[in-house]
Structures are given as C-alpha cells and as structure tokens.
C-alpha cells in the first residue's frame, strides 16, 4: 500500500511550498504535487544572456514582511525600483508629467474629485474585516454593485473616474464593469490602502529581486527536499472519507494523506473531481471567480535612452495597450529594459493579435511617450498569462457581483479533510507574493493544530 502522508499539497507555487516548508519544520511527512515542470506558480523568471527577468510577479513592497524575511533566509538580495525623472500620465487624451509616487496625483494636477474619491474608497475599505469581508453590515449592498456603478454614482470629474477605472484594470486585471465593488474594497483593505497598492516608495512596487522572483519557490523546494515533491503531476480527483484522503493524478499515480491543502486558484480548484461533492456554495464560488487577464511585456534596449531625456520610464495610460510600465533595468544597469502591462479586456483583445502586432503596438506606446528611439529594441519578450493552463490568468481570481457576500466564507472554510490556500485566500496583500506566503502560514497552522492535537 502507498505511503500515508500527513499532508498532500496540490500546487507548487509560493503558497504550497511555504506550507510544505512549515510542515517539514514541524516534523510532518508532506508531499507537494505540482502540475507543471517548474516551481513558482504565477512567478516565472527567464534568463536573457546573464540576467534574470520576471515574466510573472516581481516586486517586493515596503510592507511585505513575509517575503522580506524569506529573502533574508534564502540569501536573495533586493534593489530599489528605479523611478528618477518625469513620469507620464496620459488620461482622457491629455498628457501631463508628474514625479514621485502615483498617490501624489491625488492632490495634484487639478484632477477634480480624485482626492475625495480615493479618500472615500480608503475609508470604506478600512471598515472591512480582511478575514471576513462578507460580514460587514453593508457587504450585501456593496456586492450588488460593480466598481463602474459605484464610480458612476459617487465620483466627480471625468479624469478621476478614468483613473479609478484604470486602477481597477491594472491592479485586478479586470474591467470595472466586471468586478464587485465589495471585492474591490477587500482587495484594497488587504494591502492597507490605495497608496500602498499604487506606489513605489513604501508601496507595492518598492523593490525588485536580483535573480528574479522564481528563485524564492526554487529555494523553498530545496528546503523541503526532492523526496517531498513531484513535478508534472496534475491532480484530477480527491476522494475523502472519515479517516483519510486519496488523490489521483493525470500520470496515473495515487497518493494517500490525512489532510490535503489545495493551493491553486479557486477556478482551477473547481476543475478537480471531488468525492463526496463540494458544498453548493463552495462549488458556486469556483465557477464565479475568474482570473484576471494580463500580458506582461519586457522590452530590452541597448541603452536607457529615456533616462538621458529625464524620464523614469514610468507611465500611466487609459489609452493603452500598455496601461502601466516601469524601468526594468538590472541592478547594475548592464541590462536596460522597460516592463509594461496590457491588462483586463485589452489583454484578451490583444491576445488574439499576432506577436508582431502586439510588439508594434507596445513600441508605438513607448515612442508616443519617449520618442522614436523606443522603436528599436534589442529584444522583446511577452507572457500572456491567460494561455497558462495551470494559471488561466493573472494576477488573481476576482469575484463578480453577488459572489463574495454569498460564497466568500467558503474561500477558506475546510471541507472535511480538504483545506484551501493561495493568494486569493490571504488576509494581507491578496494577489501578491506576500499574500501567497501568508496563506501558506495560515493553512499550515490550521492543519498542524489538528494533527498535533490528535497525537496528544
């Protein structure tokens, strides 16, 4: 008979590997089942010549304590995101320049209604319990609205409306007409406020990792050891009874465990066959939590021509196809690049174009902001996360109206011996590496408490 593990973990991203590391440190026997041939989930680093660029998650924010502690443990070094010079704001056909954090726009440039609107959103989000956003007295009311409906009713000024719509697209990677306003508030609440999400200094985009972010998952995999993970093992069925779980994979293998952690996006968790079946609300949740849509582009140049012209390579645009971009040069400036994002419905539209059409559109964007030198890159890279079979999008799963209020409690609530994890289930920084790590700590504590208490 096969080994009876204490815990089997479905998913080999930051959440699953961090949970596995915590289990191993507690002396528990764990097995991680990873559907792909690599670790990292929604982080993926690619080596170009002698430098690692990130095609997935890449930033370590100023308040990302779990990620910072893990980087220190693994010996991963960080460096500040470059932002010296003028930034571009292109909104409603107008182009202006600003400096410093994006949140500086709240009080500057005479953007009617923006400061008041952001302050109101921060105020409403602060009222939510990040562990139970659905429990707020107005959660049902908020969950009946899309972000677009709330903006239309409550935000004055076309520029302010456009910037909040833009913020929804670049942070949630979905249209404001698709996203529940309750989810939007919850997303902001878990980060702290709008400024922490939008900003570089002190915010989510403060630092980058030398060597790329995927090395965090690879470092965790080394910590748990190769006997405790299996690659290319997509899970297709989970059967549980009063005593144990049986897990079957596409490659024909069978695993047994006392508990299971499903550490993949909810929409992917819904593709697994469960026996007994999931409770109706849990099943409904996985059907109503689609992934965001993002194409991430990296454009490598021979020199940082934008810096010589006094620009930072940071740009905000509601025109697109690039909605936000940053200087993506190496820490030693030996590789100079710009990272840009096509997000929300634009990502789905541009995914249907040819690679050459996408490249030309991105370069045209940069030329519009920084001149004709932008048209001549040395290397152009892109990653459409909707095409990833075992991610189905990025940065995170979001809920449509009417979902979080009715089904939100089932994001984390265990079903028998099955526990749920992943950045979508976090109490802090959902959609970010920090949230992924936090949920790994949370779910490992849940199961360790049960296992260790059962041995007393």
Swiss-Prot record:
This is Probable flavin-containing monoamine oxidase A. Pfam families: Amino_oxidase. It comes from Dictyostelium discoideum. PANTHER family: AMINE OXIDASE (PTHR43563), FLAVIN-CONTAINING MONOAMINE OXIDASE A-RELATED (PTHR43563:SF12). InterPro entries: Amino_oxidase, FAD/NAD-bd_sf, Flavin_amine_oxidase, Flavin_MAO. The modification S-8alpha-FAD cysteine is found at residue 394. Keywords: FAD, Flavoprotein, Oxidoreductase. Its cofactor is FAD. The keyword Ribosomal protein does not apply. It catalyses: a secondary aliphatic amine + O2 + H2O = a primary amine + an aldehyde + H2O2. Its EC number is 1.4.3.4. One of its GO terms (molecular function) is monoamine oxidase activity. The keyword Oxidoreductase applies. Belongs to the flavin monoamine oxidase family.
């Amino acid at each position: 008979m096969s080994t009876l593990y204490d815990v089997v973990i479905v998913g080999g991203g930051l959440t699953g590997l961090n949970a596995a590391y915590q289990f191993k440190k507690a002396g528990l026997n764990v097995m991680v089942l990873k559907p792909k041939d690599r670790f990292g989930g929604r982080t993926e680093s690619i080596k170009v010549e002698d430098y690692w660029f990130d095609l997935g998650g890449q930033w370590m924010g100023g308040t990302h304590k779990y990620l910072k502690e893990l980087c220190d443990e693994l010996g991963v070094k960080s460096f500040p995101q470059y932002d010296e010079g003028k930034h571009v704001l292109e909104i409603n056909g107008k182009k202006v320049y600003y400096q410093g954090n994006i949140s500086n726009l709240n009080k500057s440039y005479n953007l009617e209604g923006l400061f008041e609107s952001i302050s109101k959103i921060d105020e409403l989000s602060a009222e939510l319990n990040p562990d139970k956003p659905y429990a707020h007295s107005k959660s049902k009311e908020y969950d009946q609205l899309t972000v677009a409906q709330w903006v239309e009713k409550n935000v004055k000024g076309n520029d302010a409306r456009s910037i909040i719509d833009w913020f929804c697209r670049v942070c949630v990677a979905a249209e404001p007409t698709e996203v529940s306003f309750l989810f939007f508030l919850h997303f902001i609440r878990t980060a702290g406020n709008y400024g922490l999400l939008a900003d570089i200094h002190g915010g989510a985009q403060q630092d980058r990792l030398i060597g790329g972010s995927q090395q965090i998952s690879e470092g965790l995999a080394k910590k748990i050891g190769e006997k405790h993970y299996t690659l290319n093992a997509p899970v297709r069925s989970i059967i549980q009874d009063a005593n144990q779980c049986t897990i079957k994979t596409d490659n024909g293998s069978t695993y047994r465990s006392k508990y299971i952690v499903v550490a993949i996006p909810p929409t992917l968790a819904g593709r697994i066959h469960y026996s007994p079946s999931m409770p109706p609300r849990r099943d409904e949740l996985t059907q109503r939590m689609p992934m965001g849509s993002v194409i991430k582009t990296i454009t490598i140049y021979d020199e940082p021509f934008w810096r010589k012209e006094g620009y930072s390579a940071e740009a905000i645009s509601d025109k697109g196809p690039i909605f936000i971009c940053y200087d993506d040069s190496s820490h030693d400036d030996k590789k100079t690049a710009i990272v840009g994002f096509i997000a929300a419905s634009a990502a789905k539209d541009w995914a249907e174009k040819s690679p050459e059409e996408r490249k030309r559109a991105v370069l045209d964007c940069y030329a519009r902001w920084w001149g004709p030198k932008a048209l001549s890159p040395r290397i152009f890279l892109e990653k459409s996360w909707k095409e990833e079979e075992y991610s189905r999008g990025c940065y995170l799963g979001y809920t449509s109206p009417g979902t979080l209020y009715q089904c939100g409690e089932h994001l984390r609530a265990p079903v028998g011996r099955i526990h749920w994890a992943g950045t979508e289930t976090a109490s802090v920084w959902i959609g970010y590496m920090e949230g992924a790590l936090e949920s790994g700590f949370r779910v490992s504590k849940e199961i360790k408490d049960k296992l260790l208490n059962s041995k007393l």
